[in-house]
């Protein structure tokens, strides 16, 4: 088997990793940021669009993200009791 075939098999075995975009609301912890991820859902009965905000703790190895930055998160293994996401990249810096 070739090397590329082996890496494709390991990626398939690992599974799909979720990604989310959100706004950094806190960067006071070392190598950790709190990101607010907004989800828009329509109400089942009334049809009104409801904004649901979820605050996720994400690992930021270089401490690159600051408050107000838009970041891309990717799901990862549990890094602590509450941290299951990591910052992939800073999409937009705060003004």
UniProtKB/Swiss-Prot annotation:
| Gene Ontology MF terms in the entry | rRNA binding; structural constituent of ribosome
Disulphide bonds in the chain: none
What superkingdom heads the lineage? Bacteria
Where does this protein have coiled-coil stretches? none
Q: Does the keyword rRNA-binding apply?
A: yes
Tell me yes or no: is Membrane among this UniProt entry's keywords: no
**What's an example GO BP annotation here?**
translation
Record key words, sorted: Ribonucleoprotein, Ribosomal protein, RNA-binding, rRNA-binding
GO CC field: cytosolic small ribosomal subunit
Task performed by this protein: One of the primary rRNA binding proteins, it binds specifically to the 5'-end of 16S ribosomal RNA.
- Name the NCBIfam families for this protein: PRK05610.1, uS17_bact
Record family assignment: Belongs to the universal ribosomal protein uS17 family.
- Oligomeric and partner information: Part of the 30S ribosomal subunit.
Official protein name in the record: Small ribosomal subunit protein uS17
User: Could you tell me which species this protein originates from?
Assistant: Streptomyces coelicolor (strain ATCC BAA-471 / A3(2) / M145)
UniProt lists the gene as rpsQ
